[in-house]
Swiss-Prot record:
It comes from Phocaeicola vulgatus (strain ATCC 8482 / DSM 1447 / JCM 5826 / CCUG 4940 / NBRC 14291 / NCTC 11154) (Bacteroides vulgatus). Belongs to the TRAFAC class translation factor GTPase superfamily. Classic translation factor GTPase family. IF-2 subfamily. One of the essential components for the initiation of protein synthesis. Protects formylmethionyl-tRNA from spontaneous hydrolysis and promotes its binding to the 30S ribosomal subunits. Also involved in the hydrolysis of GTP during the formation of the 70S ribosomal complex. This is Translation initiation factor IF-2. Residues 536-540 are annotated as: G2.
């Protein structure tokens, strides 16, 4: 036998989840649904565990039942008169349509009026039946009543109709009410006359008149053996009539009003006592609280005793009545009060029952009044407790203040932490990538934000303070520069106007790769620089000081045009005075050209356009000018403000005119500098030379750099031991706008850093150490540890790989450009991590790091030392050496693609038409088919297609030709073919044979 879970929870007084969890612990798994079923064995386990809960429920139900009975007894007293009014009102509405009065008289309830009319013939019929059942007169009388009720009241009387109409409402009582109210006076008279008739009833056969008289005594003895449903109606109406003599007299309106006023006075007095108690307790202390609470309890007890007494009086009065309705409710304690107790049973057949529920509901406010007094007392105590706390000693007050202070401190600390989480502590050395890591956003968003404010940046490009502030503010962060004290340590000297002297302009040549930037400089310098560059493309910033025929000097910076050298172009534009943008006349305005123009515009540098290669047959300078005009750059020839010159860098056509225009722009700028002060400027490039140590190419912006000066650049410092110009000739000093190569630094400063000449080496060392410390802190801040979210993302991808790379190069700019390009190759599936980058040859420490982190080493124009090469062979570390940046990027990209798992691609090999189907025993269906296209192989997979819909997909089970197994069948040949586990082949179906081919993934 199974039991529903809903019933089990109600029986055991526990929740469904509790039952399910307990059964799961015991090894039973059931659904957590009220309709789920459990076995007897599981039920026994539950009963054993939760028997205490079941007992508690039974006890609580008993307790609540007793309390309800008490509440009803109380309610019957206080609202009796109030309800009688409503009964009267309802009687008026229901008396007219009901024909219950004559029918009730026929039953024998009102025998005096209709004794001789209708009851006599009806009594005769059941008399014979009664004799068959019981010889006594008493049961016969009652059963006569039953027989009369069964045919007449159920069919004719409207009592069952009343039940249907008034069940939704709680008051279906008005039907019998008219009998109670209207026939009080005649019934009181009849009780006096009926006393002699009771004696006659014992001797004579039963009649309808004595039936009502004998009910007073007989009901208590016989009713337990009778059916409740049929006698309920009779008993209620009789009691209402017969109990009038013993029932307490109904109170008049004045008496009820007086009672209500007395109760109100009592409540007001109690409230006054409460208020007085509060005042006394405040004045006298805790001692009198207990006394007052005792008095309050006493007052409440008095009230309850008074109600109980009234209840007992009514019960006593009720016991004198021989109410037939005691049989209606054998289980109730107050059986002598039928109209009230019948209603407490929801399954009673009495139609009057609903009305008494209304009495209970009207009584509820009275009960709540008592509860509210308790609440008042409770609130009084709480109020006093709060008031008396203030009068305690100073120690308690001190402890409270201490607790509050601790809480305030904790709250302030939390607020500070929240604010700190939105404050970025950084130095001015921060790159775009590091800034993105600190803000925990993609680096593409940082670059996009910079582009929106007109600044072109790359991933590894260092940002200045102003840009960092703008970007951080865009994403809701505040910045705090921890390097402020270091910056203040270097004081800038103010130049006097009279000390300033004209200086040579610094001109940057920018443009797309292969558009002729270096060729132009070659012609100007009369030297072939390109021959020295690997692959014929510029990979370093070249800084050259050119002396013109008229004795004037121009410093040229040649920037790379390849897209990887974004940072170099940005640096070139940053330190320059004028920008020459070269565009090939036989090409278009390319992406790097646009980027170079944007860099120059962001730096606020005047632009001169040089349209190169005009000597070529397909050259079209006007097309270039048209494209520039579309970008809002109108040249002077077309009525704009930008100067342009058509040139041929190889032949030298127009180069002289171009230089004149550049010098004209320089004169308009009025460039001046003070040569008689300590030098400042920018680091253009830095590298590690095996014979000479760390070498830095600098461009002096102001002042004069001399041999022996103490130079501080970024985290590197040192004494200038030797100086060379761009032709590797030794010089003693370098003035403003002169490029110079110096030896003597203790490290390779980052390209783009500014340099200063410091008074003492000690001061330079201190500042450099502080900067190095800040840089290490910055590195720790930007280190992004592996989070659970990232682990989850990688697991979700399934095929995730990391490629760790160590980049070493000859100069800092190239290292930065290469690492930048490699990081850009990262995808969701393969992530490139540049774990270390540096300038100089590949050392043993690089190999050790690569072995520990499972990385490859990419050397750009550098070679490993002999010891590093041997160690790499032992450790199995892969060292790749490149001279052109294109090759490095392509090979790393190929390595990343090799790490990806190949994808499977379907390739259709043949289509076969089914001509005939054979059903062979122990084999199944075999299709006789013709190969329409392609060549079907035994190893292929197949799809069965019917009317263009795929019916089956699976493997080829057998492939035969003339009873011989074959490996393949070509086009226009017949064959027999069967598919594995396919028994639904029909004539006209198409079988499509295909094979799965592994395809290498691309990035």
């Amino acid at each position: 036998m199974t039991i529903r879970l809903n019933k089990v929870t109600r029986d055991l007084n526990v929740g469904i989840t509790t039952v399910v969890e307990f059964l799961q612990k015991k090894g039973y798994t059931i659904e957590a649904s009220p309709n789920a079923k459990i076995t007897e064995e599981q039920y026994a386990v539950l009963v054993k565990e939760f028997s205490t809960d079941k007992n508690l429920k039974i006890e609580s139900e008993k307790f609540s039942q007793e309390r309800q009975n008490k509440d009803r007894n109380k309610a019957s007293i206080s609202i009796e008169g109030f309800e009688s009014k409503k009964e009267k009102e309802e009687v008026v509405k229901t008396v007219i349509p009901e024909e219950a009065r004559p029918k009730l008289k026929q039953v024998g309830k009102i025998d005096l009026d209709n004794l001789n009319k209708k009851t006599a013939p009806k009594v005769v019929e059941p008399a014979a039946k009664v004799i068959e059942q019981t010889p006594k007169a008493e049961p016969v009388v009652e059963k006569v009543v039953e027989r009369k009720e069964t045919p007449q009241p159920e069919k004719e009387t409207p009592k069952p109709v009343v039940v249907e109409e008034k069940k939704p409402e709680p008051a279906p009582q008005p039907a019998p009410a008219p009998v109670l109210e209207e026939k009080k006076e005649p019934k009181i008279e009849k009780t006096e006359e009926k006393t002699p008739q009771v004696k006659e009833m014992e001797k004579e056969t039963p009649e309808a008149a004595p039936v009502q008289e004998k009910e007073e005594d007989d009901v208590f003895k016989i009713r337990p053996t009778e059916f409740k449903s049929k006698i309920n109606v009779v008993g209620q109406i009789d009691l209402a009539a017969l109990n009038q003599s013993t029932r307490p007299k109904k109170k008049s309106k004045e008496e009820k009003r007086k009672e209500r006023e007395e109760k109100d006075k009592q409540r007001q007095e109690q409230r006054k006592l409460m208020k007085d108690a509060i005042i006394k307790e405040i004045r006298k202390g805790d001692d009198k609280i207990s006394k007052n609470s005792v008095n309050d309890d006493a007052a409440k007890k008095k009230k309850r005793n008074r109600i109980n007494k009234e209840r007992v009086d009514i019960n006593a009065a009720g016991t004198t009545n021989a109410g037939g309705a005691s049989n209606n409710n054998q289980r109730n304690d107050n059986a002598n009060r039928p109209n009230r107790n019948n209603n407490s049973k929801p399954n009673g057949n009495n139609n009057q029952g609903g009305g008494k529920f209304n009495k209970d509901r009207f009584k509820k406010p009275v009960v709540k009044a008592e509860v509210s007094d308790e609440d008042v007392a409770k609130q009084v105590k709480e109020t006093l407790a709060r008031l008396t706390n203030k009068t305690k000693n100073k120690a308690a007050k001190y402890r409270k203040e201490k607790r509050e202070n601790v809480q305030n401190r904790l709250m302030e600390q939390e607020e500070m932490e929240q604010e700190d989480s939105k404050i970025l502590k950084l130095t001015e050395f921060v790159t775009a990538n590091e800034l993105a890591s600190m803000m925990d956003i993609p680096v593409t968003q940082v670059i996009a934000t910079c582009m929106s404010i007109g600044i072109m940046v790359s991933i590894n490009q260092r940002l200045d303070a102003e840009t960092i502030n703008l970007v951080a503010e865009e994403f809701g962060y505040k910045t705090e520069y921890v390097s402020a004290e270091v910056a203040q340590a270097i004081t800038e000297e103010e130049d006097n106007e009279e000390d300033l002297q004209p200086r040579a302009p610094i001109v940057t040549v920018m443009g797309h790769v292969d558009h002729g930037k270096t060729s132009l400089l070659d012609y100007i310098r009369k030297a072939n620089v390109i021959a020295g560059e690997a692959g014929g493309i510029t990979q370093h910033i070249g800084a050259y000081n050119v002396k013109l025929e008229d004795g004037r000097h121009i410093t040229f910076l040649d920037t790379p045009g390849h897209e990887a050298f974004t940072a170099m172009r940005a640096r070139g534009a940053k330190v320059t005075d004028i920008a020459i943008i070269i565009v090939a006349a036989d090409d278009n305005v390319m992406p790097q050209t646009k980027e170079a123009i944007n860099h120059a515009m962001a730096a606020g540098v005047p632009i001169v356009f040089a349209i190169n290669k005009v000597d070529k047959p397909h050259a079209n300078p006007d097309k270039i000018k048209e494209e520039l005009a579309a970008m809002n750059f109108l040249v002077e020839e077309w009525g704009g403000k930008y100067q342009s010159q058509d040139i041929s860098a190889k032949k030298g056509t127009g180069v002289h005119d171009l230089l004149e225009k550049v010098l004209l722009e320089a004169e308009m700028l009025d460039l001046k500098a003070n040569p008689d002060r300590k030098a400042t400027g920018s680091i253009i490039e830095s590298s590690l030379d095996k014979g000479r140590g760390y070498v830095a190419t600098m461009l002096v912006a102001n002042g004069t750099l001399k041999m022996g000066d103490i130079v501080l650049a970024g985290t590197s410092y040192g004494k200038v031991k030797a100086m060379f110009n761009e032709r590797n000739q030794r010089i003693k000093e370098a003035g403003p706008s002169e490029p110079v190569l110096i030896l003597g630094l203790n490290g390779a400063p980052a390209a783009g850093d500014t340099f200063h000449v410091i008074d003492t080496e000690q001061e330079a060392r201190d500042i450099a150490n502080k900067r190095e410390q800040l840089q290490r802190e910055q590195g720790l801040r930007t280190q992004k540890l592996l989070t659970l979210d990232e682990v989850g993302r990688r697991l979700a991808l399934g095929d995730f790989h990391e490629l760790n790379v160590i980049v070493k190069g000859d100069v800092d700019g190239s290292v930065e450009a290469l690492s930048d390009s490699l990081i850009k190759l990262s995808t969701e599936q393969v992530q490139v991590n540049v774990i270390h980058k540096g300038v100089g040859q590949i050392s043993e420490s690089d190999v050790t790091l690569a072995a520990a982190s499972d990385a490859i080493i990419v050397g750009f124009q550098v070679r490993p030392s002999s010891s590093a090469g041997k160690l790499a062979e032992q450790e199995g570390v892969d060292i790749r050496k490149y001279s052109v940046i294109y090759d490095a990027i392509e090979e790393v990209k190929a390595a990343m693609e090799g790490m990806l798992a190949p994808t499977l691609k379907e390739q259709i090999t043949a289509t076969i038409e089914v001509r005939e189907v054979f059903n062979i025993t122990k084999v199944g269906l075999v299709a006789g088919a013709m190969v329409k296209t392609g060549k079907v192989k035994r190893s292929d997979k197949a799809r069965l297609i019917r009317d263009g819909i795929v019916v089956f997909t699976g493997a080829i089970n057998a492939l035969k030709r003339f009873k011989d197994d074959v490996k393949e069948v070509g086009t226009n040949f017949e064959c027999g073919i069967s598919l594995t586990n396919c028994n639904d082949i029909k004539v006209g179906d198409i079988i499509e044979a295909y094979e799965e081919v592994e395809v290498k993934q691309t990035l």
